[in-house]
């Protein structure tokens, strides 16, 4: 996640993430979530003339920033693709199994949250969109105006972890039957009224909006696909660094890494004669999950939920 306030950019866990990549001057690296380029610029500063960096992003505004950087630095290219597709992009360039490090900085960025026209936030009224790439998929408005009440409730509960998901979904459907939703503030007000137990200091629409954003952008599906692709792309000794911003993301990352540390033994029938390598770990995890320092939390409160996990490919 890149924090952007006007022209000031604060990239979460900037130094820690790039340090965890252990950048080699001649290495090839992937920034799976380019954003406004905070991590990419620091990676480039550590690369030599023969180093390479490929940036990925779905957001056209991020791509525009990336194209400017690419014009300034020939070691960098940016592609408008989800990191879930990094395997095919890497294969097209003949780099499968040759990538030195991959960084995934998950979630929505502050430029997206703070731009009312993108429709991500209930704090700033705008079109109810929420798509990272506005040219692909259906908007949040289309979803809440057409999905069955059971599906809306599932999204609020599974992706937003909203305990009043059923009540809030019914309120959405009752209101859309009268007037379809078009604006973020309109939906936020309906959710606010339907939520009977507000948490102090938290907007009652927070969890439902998170669920909608995850649904619209297939965030968890992309994460699962991206993690699998990353493992194939990395060379032996290559690093995978993932920064997550809520428990659903972190759980997927943690379970993925735990599975690979254990090897394939759990996937094989007992007493089956197999080669010893099948029981060997595919990765090793570097250190414990890392969170933002007190200094970073003070400078950037939005970093409070960031969790970084680091793994190294062994085979």
Curated annotation (Swiss-Prot):
Residues that hold S-adenosyl-L-methionine according to the record: 37-39, 57, 83, 105, 112
Catalysed reactions listed for this entry: cytidine(1402) in 16S rRNA + S-adenosyl-L-methionine = N(4)-methylcytidine(1402) in 16S rRNA + S-adenosyl-L-homocysteine + H(+)
Keywords assigned by UniProt, alphabetized: Cytoplasm, Methyltransferase, rRNA processing, S-adenosyl-L-methionine, Transferase
GO annotations of cellular component type: cytoplasm
Localization per record: Cytoplasm
Keyword Cytoplasm: yes
Single Gene Ontology BP annotation: rRNA base methylation
Recorded family membership: Belongs to the methyltransferase superfamily. RsmH family.
Protein name (database record): Ribosomal RNA small subunit methyltransferase H
Organism of derivation: Pseudomonas fluorescens (strain Pf0-1)
Gene behind this protein: rsmH
């Amino acid at each position: 996640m890149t924090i952007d306030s006007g022209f000031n950019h604060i990239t979460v866990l900037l130094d820690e993430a790039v340090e965890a990549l252990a950048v080699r001057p001649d290495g090839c690296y992937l920034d799976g979530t380019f954003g406004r380029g905070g991590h990419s610029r620091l990676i480039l500063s550590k690369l030599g003339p023969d180093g390479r960096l490929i940036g990925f992003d779905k957001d056209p505004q991020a791509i525009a920033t990336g194209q400017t950087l690419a014009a300034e630095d020939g070691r960098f290219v940016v592609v408008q693709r989800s990191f879930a597709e990094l395997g095919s992009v890497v294969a097209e360039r003949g780099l499968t199994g040759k990538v030195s490090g991959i960084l995934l900085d998950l979630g929505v960025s502050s430029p997206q949250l703070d731009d009312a026209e993108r429709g991500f936030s209930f704090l700033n009224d705008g079109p109810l969109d929420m798509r990272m790439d506005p040219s692909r998929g259906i908007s949040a408005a289309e979803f809440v105006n057409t999905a069955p009440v059971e599906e809306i409730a599932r999204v609020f509960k599974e992706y937003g972890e909203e305990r009043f998901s059923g009540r809030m979904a019914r309120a959405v459907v009752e209101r859309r039957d009268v007037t379809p939703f078009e604006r973020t503030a309109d939906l936020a007000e309906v959710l606010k009224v339907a939520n009977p137990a507000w948490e102090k200091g938290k907007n009652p629409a927070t969890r439902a909006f998170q669920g909608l954003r995850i649904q619209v952008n297939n965030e968890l599906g992309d994460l699962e696909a991206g993690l699998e692709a990353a493992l194939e792309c990395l060379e032996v000794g290559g690093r995978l660094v993932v920064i997550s911003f809520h428990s659903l993301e972190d759980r997927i990352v943690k379970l993925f890494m735990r599975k690979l540390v254990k090897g394939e033994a759990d996937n094989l029938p007992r007493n089956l004669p197999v080669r010893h390598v099948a029981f060997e770990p595919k990765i090793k995890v570097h250190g414990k999950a890392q969170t933002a320092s007190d200094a970073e939390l003070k400078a950037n409160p939005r970093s409070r939920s960031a969790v970084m996990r680091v793994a190294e490919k062994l085979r």
